[in-house]
C-alpha cells in the first residue's frame, strides 16, 4: 500500500505528510471476510483506468479509506464503525473544512445510514459533512439471480462436505445468506425451494432507514452508476439458457436468464435423483437490465454470475455448454441513482431523466460495465464534484 497511517481497519491517505485538513471518507462495500485495505487501495489507485486517490490529492483532499472486520455483517452494525470513523475524522482534522463521506456498493448504504443517524440522534456528534457520495450503490436493492442462488444452495446441500469444493460452496452459500446480502437483495431465497422475496432483515433495515428520514438531510447527495441512463440493457436475452452442464455429477442442469411472468428459471438434477425445478412469478426481466454487472473474482479471474455457476459445474466433473452467458445485471442503474423501483420492469428499461433521482446530482456510465469499476468517466466526475464543494 502507498504511504498512509492505519487506524484499525481504516487508513489515512493525506495529500501531504500531515494530518487531514479536508477529509474524504470512502467506505468499502460487501464481500466475504474483512476488508483488504491493500486490495481496495489498488482498485482505486492502480486499476489502469483512473488514479482516483491521486486525483483527490491533487484537488487538495485527504483520503480516509474505511474498512470493516466483517463485510457480511448487517449494514446497521457496520454503520457504527462508520460513525466512529466520521467522528474521529472531525475531531482530528486540522481546520474546520467540511467532510465528504460515502462509499462503494454497500459502503454507500452504510454511510448513508450512518450520516442520517448522526443527524437524528442527539447523543451523537455533528457529522460536519457537506457531501454524501455513492458509487454504484444499491439504493433500491441489488439483484442476485434466483437461479444462481438456488444452484448455489443446491450444490452446497449435495457437495458441501466435498474435501476440495466443499469449503468454497459453503462460503458462497453463506455469503448469499449473510445479514448484509439479505439486507441488499431485492429478492432472496435462503434455500433451494424457498419463495423469492424480500428477507425480513431487509424489511427491518428499510424500516430503520425510513425512521431516520431515508437520507441524510444536511448534505449534498451525489452518486454514480456503472450502468447507462439510456435504458439500453446488457444484451442478456430474457428466458434464454445462461449456462447448462451435464456429466459426472449433474444431469441436464441449467439456469435461465430471468424473464417476466411465471417462469421456470432453473433445472437442477444430480445423477440418479429427481430433477428440482426452480420457479419464479411476477419478477421483472432484470438480468438484462442496464446497470453495473455482477463480478466475481476467482482463481480463474472474474467469472461473472452465471460464469461462476459454469466454473462450479466444471469443477464438479461436468461438461458445460460453450455458449455461456457469463454475467448479468447486479445493481440496476435506477437503483444506483435512486430513480425508480427495480420491481417495475418498465422503470428498469426507461431512460433516466435528471429530475428522476433522489440524489442532487448523478452521473451514469457510457456503457454497462462491471460493478464498482473505477473509470476515468465516473472517477473524474466525482473528483470535480468534490473539488467544487
Segments the model singles out, each with a brief description of its role:
Residues 1-7, 241-389:
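Terminal low-complexity/disordered tails
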Residues 68-83:
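Catalytic nucleophile-loop/oxyanion-hole region of alpha/beta-hydrolase
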Residues 114, 214-224, 229-233:
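Extended ligand-binding clefts on enzyme/binding-domain cores
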Residues 79-201, 205-207, 229-273:
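Serine-dependent carboxylesterase/thioesterase catalytic core
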Amino acid at each position: 500500500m502507498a504511504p498512509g497511517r492505519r487506524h484499525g481497519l481504516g487508513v489515512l491517505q493525506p495529500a501531504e505528510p500531515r494530518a487531514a485538513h479536508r477529509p474524504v471518507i470512502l467506505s468499502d462495500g460487501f464481500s466475504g471476510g474483512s476488508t483488504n485495505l491493500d486490495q481496495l487501495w489498488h482498485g482505486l489507485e492502480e486499476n489502469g483506468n483512473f488514479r482516483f486517490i491521486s486525483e483527490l490529492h491533487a484537488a487538495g483532499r485527504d483520503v480516509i479509506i474505511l474498512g470493516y472486520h466483517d463485510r457480511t455483517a448487517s449494514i446497521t452494525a457496520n454503520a457504527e464503525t462508520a460513525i466512529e470513523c466520521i467522528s474521529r475524522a472531525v475531531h482530528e482534522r486540522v481546520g474546520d473544512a467540511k467532510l465528504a463521506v460515502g462509499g462503494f456498493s454497500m459502503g454507500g448504504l452504510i454511510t448513508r445510514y450512518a450520516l442520517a443517524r448522526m443527524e437524528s440522534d442527539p447523543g451523537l456528534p455533528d457529522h460536519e459533512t457537506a457531501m454524501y457520495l455513492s458509487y454504484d450503490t444499491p439504493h433500491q436493492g441489488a439483484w442476485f439471480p434466483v437461479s444462481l442462488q438456488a444452484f448455489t444452495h443446491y450444490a452446497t446441500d449435495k457437495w458441501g462436505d466435498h474435501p476440495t469444493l466443499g469449503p468454497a460452496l459453503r462460503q458462497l452459500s453463506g455469503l448469499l445468506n449473510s445479514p448484509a446480502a439479505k439486507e441488499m437483495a431485492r429478492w432472496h431465497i435462503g434455500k433451494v425451494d424457498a419463495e423469492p422475496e424480500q428477507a425480513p432483515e431487509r424489511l427491518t433495515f428499510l424500516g430503520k432507514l425510513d425512521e431516520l428520514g431515508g437520507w441524510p438531510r444536511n448534505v449534498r447527495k451525489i452518486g454514480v452508476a456503472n450502468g447507462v441512463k439510456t435504458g439500453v440493457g446488457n444484451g442478456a436475452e430474457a428466458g434464454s439458457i445462461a449456462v447448462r452442464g451435464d456429466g459426472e455429477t449433474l444431469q441436464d442442469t441449467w439456469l435461465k436468464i430471468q424473464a417476466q411472468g411465471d417462469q421456470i428459471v432453473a433445472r437442477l438434477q444430480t445423477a440418479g435423483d429427481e430433477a428440482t425445478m426452480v420457479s419464479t412469478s411476477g419478477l421483472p426481466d432484470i438480468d438484462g437490465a442496464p446497470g453495473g454487472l455482477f463480478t466475481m473474482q476467482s482463481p480463474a479471474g472474474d467469472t461473472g454470475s452465471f460464469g461462476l455457476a459454469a466454473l462450479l459445474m466444471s469443477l464438479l466433473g461436468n461438461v458445460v455448454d460453450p455458449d455461456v452467458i457469463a454475467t448479468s445485471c447486479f445493481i440496476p442503474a435506477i437503483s444506483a441513482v435512486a430513480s425508480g423501483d427495480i420491481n417495475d420492469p418498465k422503470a428498469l428499461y426507461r431512460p433516466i431523466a435528471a429530475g428522476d433521482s433522489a440524489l442532487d446530482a448523478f452521473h451514469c456510465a457510457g456503457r454497462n460495465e462491471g460493478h464498482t469499476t473505477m473509470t476515468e468517466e465516473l472517477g473524474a466526475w466525482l473528483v470535480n464534484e468534490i473539488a467544487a464543494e
